Amino acid sequence: MQTATMIAGDGSKLFTAYRLPDGEPRALVLVVHGYGEHCGRYRHVIDALTERGYAAFTLDHYGHGQSEGLRAYFDDFDRPLVDLKAYVDSFRPQYPDKPLFVLGHSMGALISLAFTLRHQAEISGLIISGAPVNADANVSPLIVALGYALNRIVPKLPLLSLGDSSILSSDPEVGRAFDADPLTYKGNMRVRLGVAINDTAKAVRERLPELQLPLLIMHGEGDTMVNPSGSKLVYERASSADKTLRIYPDMYHEIMNERQRDIALGDILNWLDLHTA
């Protein structure tokens, strides 16, 4: 992958990366990573995309990976949406006639949904994996209420545990690699980010009927980190005439890092092929 640094609106340095296929790209794919991780964990996804003829672009969110900022934190969900738009605007003019697809996982799927709702006319299709659309489904109401109270006092306090890395994938090597990776965040989720995710999930749920573009919605049936009910809700409420829901038995949260990852990756590639034919 080719890497670069993007200067965000507030002057922060954000890590970006891209890979181009041999020859003219069939389409552009923006890959949006999740909470506490970084875009380097999607190298195999990006490789698969470019080998199939797609140009793949990605970045580390503010506070994540090799980008600047307090680890695993931003003040509100507008931050990654603005950063993504600035990044897209930096490469889109080079490919004005190519369709743009967005592929997001976990918190990145929620970011992708909010981003698509804001810029739907500019996007040809959306692929989401493990989307926390029902963000509070796995959190006790007491913790949710406590989070909102603490947000006014200690917004950067690490509060919510999301579980250990063993719940990411049924492949134990994935969890071990996550734990050993110096660019991943292993602490508890900070109060304000948890509140921002919950608020954004509520806003996205209310606006799901506005989605009209092609959708591929994916979730592991064995996901205990993010309840699959959110992905089912996207499928039920989106107005898109072209929408597909894939629930994968025996897969956990990171379907693209599962033992059967080739199944999920194959579904992504085949769906893209169908929508660029």
PLM regions and their residue ranges:
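Short beta-strand/loop motif that positions the catalytic acidic residue
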Residues: 211, 217-219, 223
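Conserved alpha/beta-hydrolase
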Residues: 46-69
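Catalytic nucleophile-loop/oxyanion-hole region of alpha/beta-hydrolase
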Residues: 36-38, 65-95, 99, 264
